[in-house]
């Protein structure tokens, strides 16, 4: 059984993916559409929407931080799923509400579930650099 926080991260990733693919609709609209498709889970949904909304608000600075930590990778070369996992985890690392190892491990788990075979190692490396640059590790 997955923890509520893990489910919220997975749902936030789905919201961010949908947000990016739909041309950056307001997050509230993206979240509502996703809830209609997947069914409500208020505890998970509220946390996921809060995370996704925070990521969207800080997307430009999160992207700059990711690109700086992703050696020789422009953001445009990083897949949509991977890019949004990195945004979400970087946002959480900045918030400082969870231990950095938890944030990184959960991001790697999301990569295992939703991204390609090489994504988990890439995500882990980039987030390790970001966590160090933020003084979290």
Regions found by a protein language model. Name each.
Residues 1-137:
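N-terminal interaction/assembly modules
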């Amino acid at each position: 059984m997955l923890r509520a926080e893990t489910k919220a991260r997975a749902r936030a990733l789905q919201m961010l993916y949908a947000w990016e693919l739909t041309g950056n609709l307001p997050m509230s609209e993206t979240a509502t559409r996703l809830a209609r498709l997947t069914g409500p889970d208020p505890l998970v949904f509220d946390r996921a929407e809060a995370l996704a909304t925070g990521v969207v608000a800080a997307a430009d600075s999160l992207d700059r931080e990711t690109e700086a930590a992703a050696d020789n990778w422009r953001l445009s070369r990083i897949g949509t799923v991977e890019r949004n996992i990195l945004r979400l985890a970087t946002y959480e690392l900045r918030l400082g509400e969870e231990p950095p190892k938890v944030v990184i491990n959960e991001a790697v788990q999301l990569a295992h579930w939703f991204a390609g075979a090489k994504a988990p190692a890439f995500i882990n490396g980039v987030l390790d650099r970001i966590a160090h640059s933020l003084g979290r590790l």
